[in-house]
Amino acid sequence: MTKRYWNINLEEMMEAGVHFGHGTRKWNPRMAPYISAKRKGIHITNLTRTARFLSETCDLVFDAASRGKHFLIVGTKSKAADLVALAAIRARCHYVNKKWLGGMLTNWSTTETRLHKFRDLRAEQRAGKLNCLPKRDAAMLKRKLSHLQTYLGGIKYMTGLPDIVIIVDQHEEYTALRECITLGIPTICLIDTNCDPDLSDISIPANDDAIASIRLILNKLVSALCEGHSSYIRNR
Protein backbone atom coordinates (compact mmCIF):
# COMPACT_ATOMS: atom_id res chain seq x y z
CA MET A 1 0.00 0.00 0.00
CA THR A 2 1.42 3.37 -1.06
CA LYS A 3 1.72 6.09 1.59
CA ARG A 4 0.19 9.41 0.53
CA TYR A 5 0.14 12.92 1.92
CA TRP A 6 -3.20 13.97 3.44
CA ASN A 7 -2.27 17.40 4.84
CA ILE A 8 -2.86 16.38 8.46
CA ASN A 9 -1.26 18.80 10.91
CA LEU A 10 -1.32 19.03 14.68
CA GLU A 11 -2.18 22.74 14.85
CA GLU A 12 -5.35 22.23 12.82
CA MET A 13 -6.30 19.29 15.02
CA MET A 14 -5.75 21.31 18.20
CA GLU A 15 -7.89 24.17 16.89
CA ALA A 16 -10.67 21.65 16.19
CA GLY A 17 -10.42 20.25 19.73
CA VAL A 18 -9.60 16.75 18.50
CA HIS A 19 -7.44 16.19 21.60
CA PHE A 20 -10.14 16.80 24.23
CA GLY A 21 -11.39 13.57 25.77
CA HIS A 22 -13.97 12.80 28.43
CA GLY A 23 -13.72 13.36 32.16
CA THR A 24 -11.10 11.17 33.81
CA ARG A 25 -13.79 9.25 35.70
CA LYS A 26 -15.43 8.14 32.46
CA TRP A 27 -12.36 6.76 30.74
CA ASN A 28 -11.79 3.25 29.45
CA PRO A 29 -8.41 1.92 30.68
CA ARG A 30 -7.86 0.33 27.28
CA MET A 31 -7.49 3.86 25.90
CA ALA A 32 -4.39 4.48 28.04
CA PRO A 33 -1.92 4.10 25.12
CA TYR A 34 -3.72 6.91 23.26
CA ILE A 35 -3.85 9.40 26.16
CA SER A 36 -0.99 11.84 26.76
CA ALA A 37 -2.14 13.84 29.79
CA LYS A 38 -4.86 14.92 32.21
CA ARG A 39 -5.95 18.54 32.30
CA LYS A 40 -8.59 20.00 34.62
CA GLY A 41 -10.21 16.60 35.10
CA ILE A 42 -10.22 15.78 31.38
CA HIS A 43 -8.09 13.27 29.51
CA ILE A 44 -6.07 14.64 26.60
CA THR A 45 -5.57 12.46 23.54
CA ASN A 46 -2.08 12.10 22.09
CA LEU A 47 -2.45 14.05 18.83
CA THR A 48 0.80 12.72 17.37
CA ARG A 49 -0.63 9.20 17.50
CA THR A 50 -4.01 10.39 16.26
CA ALA A 51 -2.37 12.09 13.27
CA ARG A 52 -0.46 8.91 12.44
CA PHE A 53 -3.54 6.70 12.74
CA LEU A 54 -5.62 9.12 10.67
CA SER A 55 -2.98 9.25 7.93
CA GLU A 56 -2.71 5.45 7.84
CA THR A 57 -6.49 5.15 7.75
CA CYS A 58 -6.71 7.59 4.84
CA ASP A 59 -4.22 5.40 2.97
CA LEU A 60 -6.40 2.35 3.65
CA VAL A 61 -9.58 4.19 2.61
CA PHE A 62 -7.95 5.38 -0.61
CA ASP A 63 -6.76 1.85 -1.38
CA ALA A 64 -10.20 0.33 -0.74
CA ALA A 65 -12.03 3.01 -2.75
CA SER A 66 -9.60 2.62 -5.65
CA ARG A 67 -10.62 -1.05 -5.77
CA GLY A 68 -14.31 -0.17 -5.94
CA LYS A 69 -15.22 -1.02 -2.36
CA HIS A 70 -18.52 0.33 -1.01
CA PHE A 71 -18.62 2.44 2.16
CA LEU A 72 -21.32 3.20 4.73
CA ILE A 73 -20.94 6.13 7.15
CA VAL A 74 -22.88 5.95 10.43
CA GLY A 75 -23.45 8.80 12.88
CA THR A 76 -26.89 9.41 14.34
CA LYS A 77 -26.38 11.83 17.25
CA SER A 78 -27.46 15.40 16.63
CA LYS A 79 -23.93 16.86 16.47
CA ALA A 80 -22.85 14.35 13.85
CA ALA A 81 -25.99 13.84 11.75
CA ASP A 82 -25.63 16.75 9.32
CA LEU A 83 -21.86 16.26 9.00
CA VAL A 84 -22.36 12.58 8.17
CA ALA A 85 -24.93 13.37 5.47
CA LEU A 86 -22.73 16.06 3.88
CA ALA A 87 -19.65 13.83 3.98
CA ALA A 88 -21.46 10.86 2.46
CA ILE A 89 -23.07 12.94 -0.29
CA ARG A 90 -19.68 14.41 -1.15
CA ALA A 91 -18.13 10.94 -1.24
CA ARG A 92 -21.12 9.43 -3.05
CA CYS A 93 -21.46 6.69 -0.48
CA HIS A 94 -24.25 5.42 1.76
CA TYR A 95 -25.03 6.79 5.21
CA VAL A 96 -27.27 6.46 8.25
CA ASN A 97 -27.67 9.68 10.25
CA LYS A 98 -30.96 9.12 12.04
CA LYS A 99 -31.91 6.19 14.25
CA TRP A 100 -30.12 2.94 13.47
CA LEU A 101 -32.83 0.34 12.92
CA GLY A 102 -31.87 -2.91 14.63
CA GLY A 103 -31.03 -5.62 12.09
CA MET A 104 -30.37 -3.11 9.32
CA LEU A 105 -27.38 -5.22 8.26
CA THR A 106 -27.78 -8.54 10.05
CA ASN A 107 -31.35 -8.86 8.75
CA TRP A 108 -30.50 -7.55 5.30
CA SER A 109 -33.37 -9.34 3.54
CA THR A 110 -35.90 -7.31 5.57
CA THR A 111 -33.98 -4.09 4.94
CA GLU A 112 -33.88 -4.90 1.24
CA THR A 113 -37.65 -5.41 1.20
CA ARG A 114 -38.12 -2.00 2.86
CA LEU A 115 -35.80 -0.39 0.32
CA HIS A 116 -37.78 -1.88 -2.57
CA LYS A 117 -40.98 -0.51 -1.01
CA PHE A 118 -39.31 2.87 -0.51
CA ARG A 119 -38.15 3.05 -4.12
CA ASP A 120 -41.57 2.00 -5.39
CA LEU A 121 -43.32 4.69 -3.33
CA ARG A 122 -40.87 7.35 -4.51
CA ALA A 123 -41.50 6.35 -8.11
CA GLU A 124 -45.26 6.51 -7.59
CA GLN A 125 -44.98 9.93 -5.96
CA ARG A 126 -42.85 11.30 -8.80
CA ALA A 127 -45.35 9.94 -11.31
CA GLY A 128 -48.20 11.68 -9.45
CA LYS A 129 -49.96 8.40 -8.69
CA LEU A 130 -50.40 9.15 -4.99
CA ASN A 131 -52.49 12.21 -5.83
CA CYS A 132 -54.92 10.00 -7.72
CA LEU A 133 -55.72 7.93 -4.63
CA PRO A 134 -58.44 8.67 -2.06
CA LYS A 135 -57.20 11.32 0.37
CA ARG A 136 -56.99 8.93 3.30
CA ASP A 137 -54.96 6.34 1.37
CA ALA A 138 -52.70 9.01 -0.11
CA ALA A 139 -52.05 10.54 3.32
CA MET A 140 -51.17 7.13 4.77
CA LEU A 141 -48.71 6.36 1.96
CA LYS A 142 -47.14 9.81 2.21
CA ARG A 143 -46.57 9.28 5.94
CA LYS A 144 -45.03 5.91 5.14
CA LEU A 145 -42.80 7.51 2.51
CA SER A 146 -41.72 10.23 4.94
CA HIS A 147 -40.84 7.61 7.56
CA LEU A 148 -38.81 5.58 5.06
CA GLN A 149 -37.04 8.73 3.84
CA THR A 150 -36.04 9.63 7.39
CA TYR A 151 -34.54 6.27 8.28
CA LEU A 152 -33.55 4.76 4.93
CA GLY A 153 -32.95 7.85 2.79
CA GLY A 154 -29.19 7.58 3.13
CA ILE A 155 -29.09 3.95 1.98
CA LYS A 156 -31.80 4.09 -0.69
CA TYR A 157 -29.35 3.06 -3.42
CA MET A 158 -27.71 0.29 -1.43
CA THR A 159 -28.06 -3.08 -3.17
CA GLY A 160 -26.03 -5.19 -0.76
CA LEU A 161 -24.00 -5.12 2.43
CA PRO A 162 -21.23 -2.49 2.58
CA ASP A 163 -17.58 -3.49 2.37
CA ILE A 164 -16.43 -1.01 5.04
CA VAL A 165 -18.37 0.94 7.69
CA ILE A 166 -17.15 4.25 9.14
CA ILE A 167 -18.62 4.88 12.61
CA VAL A 168 -18.50 8.33 14.23
CA ASP A 169 -19.35 7.43 17.84
CA GLN A 170 -18.65 3.92 19.11
CA HIS A 171 -20.96 4.24 22.14
CA GLU A 172 -23.86 5.83 20.26
CA GLU A 173 -23.62 3.37 17.37
CA TYR A 174 -22.90 0.23 19.40
CA THR A 175 -25.73 -1.71 17.74
CA ALA A 176 -24.36 -0.92 14.29
CA LEU A 177 -20.86 -1.88 15.43
CA ARG A 178 -22.07 -5.23 16.81
CA GLU A 179 -23.84 -6.00 13.55
CA CYS A 180 -20.63 -5.31 11.63
CA ILE A 181 -18.67 -7.55 14.00
CA THR A 182 -21.26 -10.32 13.58
CA LEU A 183 -21.06 -10.10 9.79
CA GLY A 184 -17.30 -9.62 9.63
CA ILE A 185 -17.60 -6.19 7.98
CA PRO A 186 -14.45 -4.09 8.65
CA THR A 187 -15.07 -0.96 10.72
CA ILE A 188 -13.31 2.38 11.07
CA CYS A 189 -14.26 4.07 14.36
CA LEU A 190 -13.66 7.45 15.93
CA ILE A 191 -12.85 6.48 19.51
CA ASP A 192 -13.00 8.92 22.41
CA THR A 193 -11.35 8.27 25.77
CA ASN A 194 -14.41 6.36 27.02
CA CYS A 195 -14.35 3.85 24.13
CA ASP A 196 -12.91 0.36 23.64
CA PRO A 197 -10.28 0.41 20.87
CA ASP A 198 -10.36 -3.38 20.61
CA LEU A 199 -13.91 -3.45 19.23
CA SER A 200 -13.17 -1.79 15.89
CA ASP A 201 -10.83 -2.98 13.16
CA ILE A 202 -9.31 0.48 12.68
CA SER A 203 -9.46 3.11 15.44
CA ILE A 204 -8.87 6.86 15.24
CA PRO A 205 -8.49 8.35 18.75
CA ALA A 206 -10.37 11.65 18.63
CA ASN A 207 -13.00 13.83 20.27
CA ASP A 208 -16.28 12.40 18.97
CA ASP A 209 -18.45 15.07 20.63
CA ALA A 210 -17.16 18.34 19.14
CA ILE A 211 -18.56 19.30 15.75
CA ALA A 212 -15.22 20.73 14.59
CA SER A 213 -13.40 17.52 15.50
CA ILE A 214 -15.93 15.28 13.76
CA ARG A 215 -15.87 17.53 10.69
CA LEU A 216 -12.06 17.44 10.46
CA ILE A 217 -11.81 13.66 10.72
CA LEU A 218 -14.64 13.07 8.24
CA ASN A 219 -13.21 15.58 5.78
CA LYS A 220 -9.86 13.77 5.73
CA LEU A 221 -11.48 10.36 5.29
CA VAL A 222 -13.82 11.64 2.58
CA SER A 223 -10.94 13.27 0.70
CA ALA A 224 -9.20 9.90 0.64
CA LEU A 225 -12.42 8.18 -0.40
CA CYS A 226 -13.04 10.64 -3.24
CA GLU A 227 -9.48 10.35 -4.55
CA GLY A 228 -9.66 6.58 -4.39
CA HIS A 229 -12.99 6.53 -6.19
CA SER A 230 -11.62 8.80 -8.92
CA SER A 231 -8.68 6.43 -9.34
CA TYR A 232 -11.10 3.51 -9.63
CA ILE A 233 -13.10 5.31 -12.34
CA ARG A 234 -9.95 6.19 -14.31
CA ASN A 235 -8.56 2.67 -14.24
CA ARG A 236 -11.79 0.78 -14.76
Swiss-Prot record:
Gene3D superfamilies: Glucose-6-phosphate isomerase like protein, domain 1, Helix hairpin bin. GO terms for cellular component: chloroplast; mitochondrial small ribosomal subunit. GO terms for biological process: translation. Pfam families: Ribosomal_S2 (PF00318). Disulfide bonds: none annotated. InterPro entries: Ribosomal_uS2 (IPR001865), Ribosomal_uS2_bac/mit/plastid (IPR005706), Ribosomal_uS2_CS (IPR018130), Ribosomal_uS2_flav_dom_sf (IPR023591). Keywords: Chloroplast, Plastid, Ribonucleoprotein, Ribosomal protein. It is found in: Plastid, Chloroplast. One of its GO terms (molecular function) is structural constituent of ribosome. Belongs to the universal ribosomal protein uS2 family. This is Small ribosomal subunit protein uS2c. It comes from Piper cenocladum (Ant piper). The lineage of its organism: Eukaryota, Viridiplantae, Streptophyta, Embryophyta, Tracheophyta.
